Curated annotation (Swiss-Prot):
Segments forming a coiled coil: 1-74
UniProt name for this protein: Transcription inhibitor protein Gfh1
GO biological process: DNA-templated transcription elongation; regulation of DNA-templated transcription elongation
SUPFAM superfamilies: FKBP-like, GreA transcript cleavage protein, N-terminal domain
Record organism: Thermus aquaticus
Domain notes: Inhibitory activity is regulated via a pH-induced conformational change of the structure. At pH above 7, Gfh1 is in an inactive flipped orientation that prevents binding to RNAP. At lower pH, Gfh1 switches to an active orientation, which enables binding to RNAP and inhibitory activity.
A Pfam short name: GreA_GreB_N
Family (UniProt): Belongs to the GreA/GreB family.
DNA repair is among the record's keywords: no
Amino acid sequence: MAREVKLTKAGYERLMKQLEQERERLQEATKILQELMESSDDYDDSGLEAAKQEKARIEARIDSLEDVLSRAVILEEGTGEVIGLGSVVELEDPATGERLSVQVVSPAEASVLENPMKISDASPMGKALLGHRVGDVLSLDTPKGKKEFRVVAIHGR
């Protein structure tokens, strides 16, 4: 049996949008490939080969997204009392007062490019956050070594 993939509602919607975009890209790539095949006298043409590879990459991405979405279980809204999958957490460095906001998500949703950063529950930081409450102080491994953070706020999923 395939393992379920836990997603926030927003994460599920984002992946559905990506799937739509990839399907549109596939249609365009197929059209370009057909045009190249019709106009090419030499089937060893590097442009034709590149188009085939791009189409294959898009198909693989579609397969991957469809697989994740077919196994998706959308998380219910949390209470905000305990950090769990989908929680948005505000952390503060007690030494500097610097604040950091992250959301704990499944590996399928993880992205450091978003705000708040989406941290995988399977990552060291994600594992360290799970189960904590407001006021807890925890030690996290960062690229600059161990750092302490205090949980300032937890917002539900």
